[in-house]
Regions:
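Active-site/acyl-donor-binding loops of N-acyltransferases
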Residues: 19-46, 184-250
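Short, high-confidence coil segments that cap the C-terminus of an alpha-helix
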Residues: 1, 131, 186-189
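A generic secondary-structure signal for well-formed alpha-helical elements
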Residues: 68, 72, 96-104, 183, ...
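Conserved acetyl-CoA-binding loop-helix of GNAT-fold acetyltransferases
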Residues: 168-181
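A conserved beta-strand-loop-helix scaffold within acyl/acetyltransferase catalytic domains
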Residues: 3-168
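Short glycine/serine- and small hydrophobic-enriched flexible loop segments
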Residues: 120-123, 178-185
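Alpha-helix boundary/interfacial micro-motifs
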Residues: 113, 156-157, 170, 189, ...
C-alpha cells in the first residue's frame, strides 16, 4: 500500500484521492490527522489581535516591545526590491546559523547544497511574485527574519530565524506579529498556513484558526492471492496504527 501525507483533509486533493480510490475500488483510509495553526480572517489586524490573544499576553508583548526599543533603533520591513534579495538571504542564513541549528549542524548554511537550494527557491519565488520576506532590525542588524511563499490567494510560512541572544525579548513572536499585520492588511492574501507542528505553543497562541492535515493509506492493485494478502496487510496495518495512536494518547 501507499502512504500519502501532508494533505489538507478538507481540500480538493483529499477529495480527489478518495474519489479515484472509490472509482478504482481501492481500499482507502485516513490513518492520521492533526490540526495546525492557520490565519484566515476578514477582520483587521488590530481587531483580530484584541479578539483572539489573551489580554495578559498582549500586555506582555507591549512590555517586550518597549524593552527591546530601549536597546536601539527598531525597524520592521517587508522586502519590496528584488535587488535586496541576495543581502536578505545572506542575512537569514547567518542569523539561523548563529543559533542552536548552527551548533547542531542543521542550519541551511552548514551544507552547501542546502544553501544553494534555499537561494534558488527564494530567487524563483521572487521572480514569480510569490516571495513574502519580513525582517526586524536592531540598529541596522537583523534580529528576526521570516520567509513565506505566496500561492494564488494564500500563503505558506517556510522558515523563521531570530537572534537567540535576544531571546528574552521574544523576537520570533514579534516578527510573527508583524506578519499577522502584513497578511490581514493585504486584501490579496486571504489565508496563510503556518506549516507548524501540531500544538505549537507560540503560533497557536497568536493564530486562532486551524487547518486539518491528514495522512492516507491507499491499497495497491493486485488480483487473486496477491490481492487477498494485500487486503489482509491493509487491515493489519490499520489495526497497528490505531493501537499505536491509542498508546501515544494515553
Amino acid at each position: 500500500f501507499l502512504h500519502i501525507s501532508g494533505i489538507d483533509a478538507a481540500g480538493a486533493n483529499a477529495a480527489a484521492l478518495e474519489a479515484v480510490c472509490v472509482e478504482q475500488r481501492r481500499n482507502f483510509a485516513e490513518i492520521q490527522r492533526y490540526d495546525r495553526a492557520l490565519l484566515r480572517s476578514t477582520t483587521d489586524a488590530d481587531s483580530y489581535w484584541d479578539t483572539h490573544v489573551r489580554a495578559k499576553k498582549r500586555k506582555e508583548i507591549r512590555r517586550l516591545q518597549k524593552r527591546l526599543a530601549d536597546l536601539g533603533a527598531i525597524k520592521s520591513r517587508i522586502m519590496s526590491e528584488a535587488s535586496d534579495l541576495p543581502d536578505w538571504a545572506t542575512d537569514f542564513l547567518a542569523l539561523e546559523a548563529s543559533g542552536w541549528k548552527g551548533i547542531a549542524g542543521t542550519a541551511l548554511q552548514c551544507r552547501a547544497a542546502d544553501t544553494a537550494f534555499f537561494m534558488e527557491a527564494l530567487s524563483a519565488a521572487q521572480e514569480n511574485g510569490r516571495l513574502h520576506f519580513l525582517r526586524i532590525d536592531l540598529d541596522g542588524k537583523a534580529i528576526a527574519m521570516l520567509v513565506n511563499f505566496r500561492h494564488l490567494d494564500g500563503a505558506f510560512s517556510l522558515k523563521i530565524a531570530f537572534d537567540e541572544t535576544l531571546g528574552r525579548f521574544s523576537p520570533g513572536v514579534l516578527i510573527e506579529i508583524d506578519n499577522l499585520h502584513a497578511v490581514l492588511g493585504d486584501p490579496s492574501v486571504t489565508w496563510m498556513d503556518s506549516c507548524a507542528a501540531a500544538d505549537h505553543p507560540m503560533i497557536d497562541s497568536i493564530w486562532a484558526e486551524r487547518r486539518s492535515i491528514a495522512q492516507f493509506r491507499i491499497a495497491l492493485k493486485g488480483s487473486g492471492l496477491i490481492r487477498t494478502r494485500r487486503a489482509a496487510a491493509f487491515a493489519i496495518a490499520g489495526a497497528a496504527e490505531r493501537a499505536a495512536a491509542y498508546v501515544k494518547g494515553r
